[in-house]
Amino acid sequence: MPMKLPAGKTCAFVISFDFDAEEVWLAENPENADRPGVLSQGSYGAKVGLGLVLDTLDHLGLQATFFTPGRVAERYPEQMREIVALGHELGHHGYTHTSPTKLTKAEELEELLKGKAALEQFGTQVTGYRSPSWEVSPNTFDLLVAHGFHYSSSMMDDIKPYLHPAHKIVELPVQWILDDAPYFWFSSGGDWNRTIRSAKDVQEIWREEFIGIRALGGLTMLTMHPQFIGRPSRIAMLEEFLTFVKSHDDVWIATAGEVARAVK
């Protein structure tokens, strides 16, 4: 089923953030629970990066979708209230940041329900889901349907939104090329050969991909993390890039939920 774009629009653009804070580091390696230096990278996202992100979006008059683990929402309620107060959408991103492929069906259900409850305490209905690690189990879509979710943003098999035929869940495809993590993620406990990319280089990559998707009438799903994109040089790059996107009158800049409703 094709996207029903607003009049005069030829493609869609979604600004999304995975507000993982410390949870992504705990999921990567449980031993990180005893490594405050490692965890502080996630804390930066909550304490500094998110504020810079929200200020940038407010300055540009843009709305975004924040996919947030439930445990992060519980740990940082003030930040969650600010996200909601500014009119942004909340999306489900697990309770912890554990891949569904590592869970039994009962454990995955518990993650789904606890995460949903943690987000909805901030007064907003949560209908969108993004899997931690962009991976799903054989049970994921059955559970999403059973518990009132309307869309997923976890798969990489298209540049246009589509309906999962067996479940009637809208998929808003993602791709690593439009994620900030491959360019900016770095940990001293990981691969020291990984190179941190310059913000200028990443903007060039994102511009080229956006231009290509726009020409094909697709969805550009930009995926970022406050702890990575929220560094001073990168937030300046993000403002430049979003200003460039806004300069194209035929681009529909919307939240993930708005795009999903245009498909279903």
Predicted regions and their residues:
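Catalytic alpha-helical scaffold of carbohydrate-active enzymes acting on polysaccharides/glycoconjugates
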Residues: 1-128, 133-177, 200-222, 230-264
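Surface-exposed cleft-lining segments at the edges of enzyme active sites
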Residues: 126, 188-199, 225-227
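Glycine-rich, positively charged active-site loop/lid region within alpha/beta enzyme cores that binds
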Residues: 171-195
